UniProtKB/Swiss-Prot annotation:
Keywords: ATP-binding, Kinase, Nucleotide biosynthesis, Nucleotide-binding, Transferase
Key word Transmembrane helix present: no
Alphabetized GO MF terms: ATP binding; dTMP kinase activity
Coiled-coil spans in chain: none
Top-level taxon: Bacteria
Protein name: Thymidylate kinase
Enzyme class: transferase
Entry binding sites for ATP: 11-18
Pfam families listed in its UniProt record: Thymidylate_kin
Family classification: Belongs to the thymidylate kinase family.
Function in brief: Phosphorylation of dTMP to form dTDP in both de novo and salvage pathways of dTTP synthesis.
Keyword Nucleotide-binding part of the UniProt annotation: yes
């Protein structure tokens, strides 16, 4: 039985989610929660090694999905599940919704295969709250171009990101009980006001 809460941050590259992750962590700390901040792919020593491979090496789309879930299984076993059992609040920069969006939407991998992997790797674990930061593709691209050297996903064409974004929004419609879609074109102050209200709701 888990006693902590599991929050995930999602969105296409350039959506601005990482800007607000630390803000939510700080809000929870103010509420006297013990917070574990982590990311996918990654979160463990093995996961971080797989992250480097996944972000920079070309591979078959099924290999990519399998490695994502391999890193996730280790992440759950070593970080997420123990933290929740302790009563901690876990905030993860991406989780399984990202695999459905990027590998399912962007790469066109059969959704049934992803469903099977999800049921194998974490049949009883879902986020309590998923914050989906949504922006138009041109805004996301402009933000990416202004930042840093891009990884292989960030270098994908507009069609890839359109399909990835569409799958994210489909997931949000499928699981409205845990998703909040955040309009990430607004000011940081406006977004943080919304996040403050959402956090208050989940911690009520």
């Amino acid at each position: 039985m888990t006693t902590g809460k599991f929050i995930t941050f999602e969105g296409i590259d350039g959506a601005g989610k990482s800007t607000h992750l630390s803000f939510v962590a700080e809000l929870l700390c103010e509420r006297k929660k013990t917070v574990v901040v982590t990311r996918e792919p990654g979160g463990t020593s093995l996961g971080e090694e797989l992250r480097e491979i996944l972000l920079h090496e070309k591979m078959h789309l099924e290999t990519e999905a399998l490695l994502m879930f391999a890193a996730r299984r280790e992440h759950i076993a070593q970080v997420i599940a123990p933290a929740l059992e302790r009563g901690d609040w876990v905030i993860s920069d991406r989780f399984t919704d990202a695999t459905f969006a990027y590998q399912g939407g962007g790469r066109k991998l059969d959704r049934a295969k992803l469903n099977a992997l999800e049921q194998w790797v974490h049949p009883h674990l879902q986020p309590h709250l998923t914050l989906l930061f949504d922006v138009p593709l041109d805004v996301a691209r402009a933000r990416l171009d202004a930042t840093r050297t891009l990884d292989k996903f960030e270098q994908e064409k507009a069609e890839f990101f359109a399909a990835t974004r569409a799958e994210y929004l489909r997931r949000a419609a499928e699981f409205p009980q845990r998703f909040h879609v955040i309009d990430s074109t607004r000011s940081i102050a406006a977004i943080q006001e919304q996040l403050r209200a959402i956090v208050a709701g989940i911690d009520s």
